[in-house]
Amino acid sequence: KDALNREGVERVINRLKEMDFDYIVCDSPAGIETGALMALYFADEAIVTTNPEVSSVRDSDRILGILASKSRRAELGLEPIKEHLLLTRYAPGRVDRGEMLSVGDVQEILAIPLLGVIPESPSVLKASNAGEPVILDHESDAGQAYDDAVARLLGEKRDFRFLQEEKKGFLSRLFGG
């Protein structure tokens, strides 16, 4: 992580720009360390990813402060970075029980547009362990939610799904389905 420096990252990004990609995505580690700061500095858009837990939302709020004050765009007085909120590991039942923040709570704290809500799902761990992106699992709620978020990022209008706990029907409750 200490091998990163601003000039080196800028050089790599400029080379990628010359290759005429539609998008250059710089994933950064959680927290506010060198890798994250380098990605933030050069961002034109930022997908701020957080969990509905107080500590994660606080970290995301600090990231938003850095985007607004210490990015290249901020230093040069350019148009601000376009920010998007991606809420992951969301469990409506846990929200109902007061165990985690709601989508509304997180939106109120961070005050940036909601891009997507990814439900807590065993398919995420399964895909990660298989080395495959969960978005390719079209049967999973998480895969579908990531697909929705990407579509919204590209300008498509999609309703938000997986925000309410699925109510089991009578037969499912009776037979444990």
Give residue spans per PLM region.
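C-terminal lobe/tail of nucleotide-utilizing enzymes
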Residues: 74-177
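Glycine-rich oxoanion-binding loops at beta->alpha junctions
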Residues: 3-7
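Conserved short-loop catalytic and cofactor-binding motifs
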Residues: 1, 48-51, 134-137
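Conserved catalytic-core segment of NTP-binding enzymes
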Residues: 8-11, 16-23, 28-113
